[in-house]
Amino acid sequence: LKENYDVGFIQILDENFGSNKKHAYEVADILHKHNLLWFACGVRCTSTTNADIKYFKDRGCSALKYGVESGSQKILDVMEKVFTVDDVYKALDGCIEHNVFSPIAIMLGMPGENESTVEATGKFVGNIASKLGVHPKYLAWDIMWALPLPGTPLWEYGEQLGVIGKEDEDVVDYLTRVSDAGTYKRYYINLNGAPISEVLFWEYLVKFEASRTFHKLNNVNKELSEKYKKVTGGVIAVNPRNSLKYTALKFTQ
């Protein structure tokens, strides 16, 4: 690859990179031997230790992408991930410590998802962004949607709900639509039970909550807030009725 195509960077697409430590270390050694930078996509937070991350970093690893899925322990348990939110923080903190970029992937729309669990995920993303010192929009995080596939519990659940047909032609039609399509919103089948308008809003809610949490933790808007208070305070002092112009209602659950 290097000699014929001048390749200098390798992206590894794996289901669980690092679960076989011997294999992962050998891959890192080989890529380092050929002076290649690399990025492993598809890493489980409990499959890498702080020492592993350092080992990979020292051998040319520029990024590790963890399947975070959710910042809500409730949803992680529904997914049967068998790890905790703290486990995810530990892995990402290791990446931050060793200067390894870590884009994260989350998933919305699982059975049991609601505004509270979505907000928890948004807070999680905002916390990570705060640790890195960058706004969430620069994290390169992916928002996926729960997509049932044959042979999975999610598929069986969809059949039980009646949102996935059991006849052969129904299955063929569904698989034709989602084959190689990715877990994106336009292919989402509502397994949640909440109104679809509410479900689709969750994508915006998780982004809003991530941004709100980031600003709260970093207090980046403090200076602007103080200037705003001085300006609006002067206007209101001259004419108190102007304060009504900017009245806003809080969003509540």
Language model features by range: what are they?
Residues 51-53, 111-129:
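Catalytic cores of alpha/beta
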Residues 22, 74, 78, 108-116, ...:
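Flexible glycine/acidic-rich beta-alpha junction loops that bind and position SAM and/or redox cofactors
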Residues 91-94, 124, 144-145:
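Generic recognition of well-ordered alpha-helical segments
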Residues 153-158, 164-253:
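Radical SAM enzyme core and accessory elements
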Residues 1-103, 108-110:
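Conserved SAM/AdoMet-binding glycine-rich loop
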Residues 56-58, 83, 121-123, 159-162:
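Short, hinge-like loop/turn segments at secondary-structure boundaries
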Residues 4-5, 34, 91-102, 128-136, ...:
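A structural motif corresponding to the C-terminal end of an alpha-helix
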